[in-house]
């Protein structure tokens, strides 16, 4: 049994139909006997929509609040995918950075990963769950939400792969769910 981490971008989780397609792919891996962690981005266009909203409210939004706003997009994706996976008969749990102590620097909007506490993720995997994890975000030592900047979900997937000694990290393109990269972290 291998530990596989899959990362899907915003277009892959843009609507219910696409979320269900991702769920089918995830369940296929789980049924093959693998442990699966899925890292997802916010639905397509959601981050840009949230950025626009922040700048409609202020010419210079507070960076802490900006990060709080931006991370709401991933919440939609992780919960949606966990629901879709469970509907296909597999146990699934959605997790945010604060739930697993995904520690970053305190530089809002451009944080760097410091440490990942893998205990909760490993426990959820051991319980038979597909773990659906929010990409792009972290938490500081003072429990402040941060974002990793554009491309942060890819970074999240690779960092999780390294921290958990995953057998593979798979990053799927948004265009047609083609696998563009397989690596050993």
Question: Where is each model-derived feature located?
Answer:
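Nucleotide/pyrophosphate-binding catalytic subdomain
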Residues: 1-183
């Amino acid at each position: 049994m291998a530990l596989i981490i899959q990362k899907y971008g915003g277009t892959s989780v843009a609507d219910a139909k696409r979320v269900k397609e991702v769920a089918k792919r995830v369940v296929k891996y789980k049924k093959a006997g693998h442990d699966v962690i899925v890292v997802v981005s916010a639905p397509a266009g959601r981050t840009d929509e949230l950025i626009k909203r922040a700048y409609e409210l202020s010419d210079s939004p507070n960076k802490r609040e900006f990060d709080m706003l931006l991370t709401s997009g991933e919440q939609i994706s992780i919960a949606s995918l966990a629901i879709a996976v469970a509907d296909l008969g597999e146990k699934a749990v959605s997790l945010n950075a604060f739930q697993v102590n995904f520690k970053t620097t305190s530089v809002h909007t451009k944080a760097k990963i410091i440490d990942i506490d893998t205990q909760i993720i490993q426990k959820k995997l051991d319980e038979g769950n597909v773990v659906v994890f929010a990409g792009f975000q972290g938490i500081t030592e003072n429990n402040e939400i941060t974002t990793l900047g554009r491309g942060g979900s890819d970074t999240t997937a690779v960092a999780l792969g390294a921290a958990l000694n995953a057998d593979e990290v798979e990053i799927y393109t948004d265009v047609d769910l083609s696998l563009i990269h397989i690596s050993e972290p």
